[in-house]
């Protein structure tokens, strides 16, 4: 299923590319496919490789196919010139046991389609072996993508990173998921964002806006969140996600069930305007490539998802500089791989004609600099990378950055390319360019983008930008001040680290009308509550303190009772809202969707099945005086334990309940305060924060001190 404006054909089948877990397209059109016949849960050595496919005439049929290299669990690929960056595991044949996961670079100097020997490890141990050994490489570190700023961005799943090490000796540990970045030589590794669950890839637009589509099990089911990644942002998983949402950057949307996989920001001039300049997000569970229409909202965005292309269990997507879009279809290869399943599909606009993209390394200097003015994001990135090999052209590149007639995307590409070419020597010219409001945001970012190249960067330009009229500039300034390392700016950051709500007292919920003890598989509880003064009835199930695994609970025979003793079954009424952390909510149904039965095996057609944590809200019928039910676990629960709570409002279900906001509603008003607080933490500005307690800057100070 594709839009009528596109044409598609099968590029390769399982004979060449079974189990395609990832892919990338070189700017010049070569397609690299990561074949992982272990899938997410399989184990053992020798089941992975990277296949290189070449379609030199643009007819959609590869004339050449070679095994570029053999690696275990290939999960991310980037082609730059004659180098291929590969995210992969290591499973020695001698043990058959996963030993490590690395980011490596392979070279093919003669461009014959086969790597010249073993790859060089750039970052070792980018995912802890223990979890990968026990479960498989499913919540592990996955996709990689190159930004126009020259960093490689790594999508880290909720296995996290423990003891990763770069080529310069930098070590990094990050508990849980997030985005980590590193220079292409393996140096300067650092955390970009954290607090994510199971992301697979990142989409990066020409202005360094970054988007992910991950999933999480901490609310509303196993749901996916579409997130705008803002540098230094904390997105909540797992510690703040539910009960301290006022301290996180919220997602742009909670999109229900699914499994986010590959991601790409598409900006290619050969594509129809309708489908161009958009983030494309793969959803493996829904077999959909999805467009998210993003609209600026302060320093962030709002979004509207739109189905774009249906592809069977789509795992990844990429585009070359001629406009050929490729999608990797897992196509039912299962959780442990299947050599007879999987393929790669090609998409182009109707009427598209193949125009070969020249290798940037072969271009003359003038043509190469001009390529920064291309309307293709792929072409600009390729040009930028080749320009790094020609430092003598730095001034010509800066001329593009200065050119107000150039597109904004071209100017931004030139700013980041110039900084990479000239290093710290670029800072004086860039500081002068900060006076141009059209590019100020990216100038500020480039000045502090690399901590090793900040000589000559003064705090003044960043402090002044905290009060800029553009909220994106404000956020860039706060992030930059945190990286600059000068604690004397703490007072300026404290002034920015307020949401304007610090004076509002948090109102704690009142005690519930009923709260049971912990109920396990051997017990149940009789519930009889006076609801004569209730307007709404909140039926809450929380976990019993041991997590929510198999917490299949039920409100058995729930009824309202009036003063005359007449009973009204809840089954005959309509609830106002019902949300559960996992599974189904329904009468006569367990959370699993099976027939609801008591622990003794008795069918309960009037019972209301649910799962911890859940909240079900009913309007209280006129004349009702009591609510009665029996709370217990369903027969499908194994070792669950829960508590039942009845209240007239949402109670504090666990420690941390209070004045909090939703986890997936855009909140641009929090962004400057959030990154300013993170900057204070990075500057270790505890003394300034303590001094600010009790002043108008208490909110940010206390937030940072926590």
Language model feature labels by segment:
Residues 362-370, 391-403, 422-434, 453-467, ...:
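Amphipathic alpha-helical scaffolding segments comprising HEAT/armadillo-like alpha-solenoid repeats
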Residues 1-368, 382, 386, 656:
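Beta-propeller domains with acidic blade repeats across secreted/periplasmic ectodomains
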Residues 24, 32, 78, 83-87, ...:
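Hydrophobic, aliphatic-enriched repeat segments that assemble into extended interaction scaffolds
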Residues 181-222, 300-340, 460, 464-505, ...:
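Repeat-solenoid scaffold signature
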Residues 355-359, 377-391, 409-423, 428-432, ...:
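Structural detector for internal amphipathic alpha-helices that build alpha-solenoid repeat scaffolds
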Residues 506-656:
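Gly-Asp-aromatic-enriched flexible segments
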Residues 235-236, 350-358, 563-570, 651-654, ...:
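Short, charged low-complexity linker/loop segments at the C-terminal edge of domains
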């Amino acid at each position: 299923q594709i839009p009528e404006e596109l044409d598609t054909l099968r590029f390769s089948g399982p004979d060449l590319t079974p189990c395609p877990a990832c892919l990338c397209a070189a700017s010049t059109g070569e397609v690299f496919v990561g074949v992982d016949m272990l899938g997410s849960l399989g184990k053992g050595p020798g089941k992975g490789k990277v296949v290189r496919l070449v379609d030199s005439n643009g007819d959609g049929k590869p004339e050449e196919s070679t095994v570029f290299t053999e690696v275990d669990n290939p999960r991310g690929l980037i082609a730059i010139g004659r180098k291929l960056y590969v995210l992969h595991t290591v499973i020695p044949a001698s043990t058959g046991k996963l030993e490590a996961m690395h980011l490596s670079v392979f070279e093919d100097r003669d461009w014959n389609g086969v790597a010249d020997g073993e790859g060089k490890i750039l970052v070792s141990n980018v995912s802890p072996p223990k979890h990968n050994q026990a479960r498989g490489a499913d919540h592990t570190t996955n996709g990689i993508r190159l930004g126009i700023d020259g960093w490689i961005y790594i999508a880290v799943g909720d296995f996290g990173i423990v003891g990763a090490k770069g080529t310069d000796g930098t070590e990094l540990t990050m508990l849980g998921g997030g985005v980590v970045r590193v220079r292409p030589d393996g140096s300067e590794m650092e955390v970009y964002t954290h607090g994510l669950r199971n992301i697979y890839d990142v989409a990066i637009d020409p202005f360094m806006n970054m988007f992910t589509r991950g999933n999480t099990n901490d609310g509303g089911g196993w749901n996916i969140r579409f997130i705008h990644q803002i540098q230094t942002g904390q997105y909540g998983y797992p510690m703040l996600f539910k009960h301290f949402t006022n301290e996180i950057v919220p997602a742009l949307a909670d999109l229900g069930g699914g499994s986010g996989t590959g991601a790409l920001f598409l900006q290619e001039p050969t594509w129809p305007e309708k489908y161009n300049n958009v983030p494309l997000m793969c959803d493996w569970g829904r077999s959909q490539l999805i467009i998210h229409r993003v609209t600026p909202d302060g320093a962030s965005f709002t979004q509207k998802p739109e189905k774009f292309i249906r592809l069977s269990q789509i795992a990844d997507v990429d585009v070359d500089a001629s406009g050929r879009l490729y999608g990797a279809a897992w196509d039912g290869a299962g959780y442990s791989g299947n050599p007879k399943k999987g393929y790669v599909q090609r998409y182009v606009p109707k009427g598209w004609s193949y125009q070969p993209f020249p290798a940037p390394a072969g271009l003359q200097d003038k043509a190469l600099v001009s390529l920064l003015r291309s309307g293709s994001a792929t072409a600009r990135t390729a040009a930028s990378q080749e320009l790094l090999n020609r430092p003598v052209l730095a001034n010509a590149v800066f001329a593009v950055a200065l050119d107000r007639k150039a597109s904004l995307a071209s100017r931004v590409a030139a700013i980041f390319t110039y900084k990479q070419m000239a290093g710290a020597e670029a800072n004086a010219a860039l500081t002068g360019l900060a006076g141009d409001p059209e590019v100020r945001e990216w100038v500020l970012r480039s000045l502090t983008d690399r901590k090793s190249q900040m000589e000559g960067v003064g705090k003044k330009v960043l402090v002044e930008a905290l009060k800029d009229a553009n909220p994106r500039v404000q956020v860039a300034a706060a992030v930059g001040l945190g990286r600059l390392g000068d604690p004397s700016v703490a007072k300026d950051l404290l002034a920015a680290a307020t949401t304007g709500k610090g004076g509002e007292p948090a109102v704690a919920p009142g005690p519930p009308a009923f709260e049971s003890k912990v109920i396990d598989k051997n017990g149940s509880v009789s519930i009889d509550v006076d609801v004569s003064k209730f307007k709404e009835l909140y039926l809450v199930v929380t976990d019993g303190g041991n997590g929510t695994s198999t917490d299949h609970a039920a409100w058995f025979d729930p009824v309202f009772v009036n003063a005359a003793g007449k009973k009204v079954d809840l089954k005959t009424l309509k609830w106002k809202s019902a949300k559960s952390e996992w599974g189904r909510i329904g009468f006569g149904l367990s959370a699993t969707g099976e027939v609801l039965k008591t622990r003794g095996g008795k069918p309960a057609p009037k019972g209301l099945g649910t799962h911890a944590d859940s909240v079900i809200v009913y309007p209280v019928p006129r004349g009702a005086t009591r609510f009665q039910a029996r709370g217990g676990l369903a027969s499908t629960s194994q070792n669950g334990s829960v508590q039942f709570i009845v209240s007239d409002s949402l109670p504090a279900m666990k420690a941390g309940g209070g004045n909090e906001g939703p986890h997936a509603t855009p909140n641009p008003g929090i962004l400057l305060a959030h990154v300013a607080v993170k900057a204070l933490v990075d500057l270790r500005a505890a003394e300034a924060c303590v001094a600010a307690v009790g002043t108008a800057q208490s909110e940010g100070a206390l937030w940072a001190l926590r």
